[in-house]
Amino acid sequence: MVRTPSKAKRDRVVVIGTGHVGSSYAFALMNQGVAKELVIIDIDQEKASGDVMDLNHGQAFAPSVTSIWHGNYEDCKEADVVCISAGANQKPGETRLDLLEKNVIIFKEVVDAVMASGFNGIFLVATNPVDLLTQATQVFSGLPKKRVIGSGTTLDTARLRFMLGEYFQISAKHVHAYVVGEHGDSALPLWSTATIGNVPLSQYLLRNRAYKKADLDDIFTNVRDAAYEIIHKKGATYYGIAMSLVRITKALLKNEHAVMTVSTFLNGEFGAKEVCIAVPAIVNRNGVREVLELKLNDIERQQFTESVQMLKGTYKTIMQTGHSF
């Protein structure tokens, strides 16, 4: 039986997994006053309890009061959003597929426990590989596809806009460009639809000869490899993705109908079906309201198709290992 969305507006967010990403997400949620209630769940209960104490001690400096506590899966019943940031870390010598196999098993246990509570809200997936784990979460939960969302390429898109803003010396808020596809090496920028203000990027380059089209490829290479560089320098990425997750959460709780490149299921859009992948989508309190199907040029369409095929191939491989994915 498919559950219908709850009409209650408790603005309760449950964070499952408070490693670097989960704890940074909780911290950013409180700092921005997005949620009224924040529940922390982690297999390491001492760590979760410590995070709650640390966060609560900063309540006097937050823009609004957030009720924060160390909870359990029963607290998911009244949650509007459950964010899963739990999972195994990739070890030296492990492949992406090795990591996926471990995290699928973890996610099955987590999602089953959440659903057993009577959860009736929206799943927000942060753990990598996020597109495939978002798909797994939907299968395990049985929730409507629009109510299971992954962080997708929201951070990649933010990185692209930041770097383009630096290059053109324009506020990143007025650079409109998307990164779509897998959150990973097969992601691609949509240069053909990018604009500076309301001016198409291609026209802006023609009007400003100081900027070179060839530089765009270097900029995207830096976007694509940013996570690797940050991991090399500090061991992990967590501030940027935490802020991306908060932005998605705000769109969900505040019913913003905001456009973001989240991981969601396609049903013919962009020529793809039965795959969870990052594309521009309208996000509101019910999850993904609509996928915005942009017109891609031939090169972009080919790259997007390759990204889809890569994800589907990995999906098939996991299916063959015996996981009910």
Swiss-Prot record:
The lineage's top-level taxon is: Bacteria
Q: PROSITE patterns under this entry?
A: L_LDH
List of residues binding NAD(+): 21, 42, 47, 73, 87-88, 126-128, 151
Q: What coarse category fits the chief subcellular location reported for this protein?
A: cytoplasm
| Positions annotated as active site in the UniProt record | 183
State how it assembles.
Homotetramer.
PANTHER family in alphabetical order: L-2-HYDROXYCARBOXYLATE DEHYDROGENASE (NAD(P)(+)) (PTHR43128), L-LACTATE DEHYDROGENASE (PTHR43128:SF16)
Known function: Catalyzes the conversion of lactate to pyruvate.
Name the chain's protein: L-lactate dehydrogenase
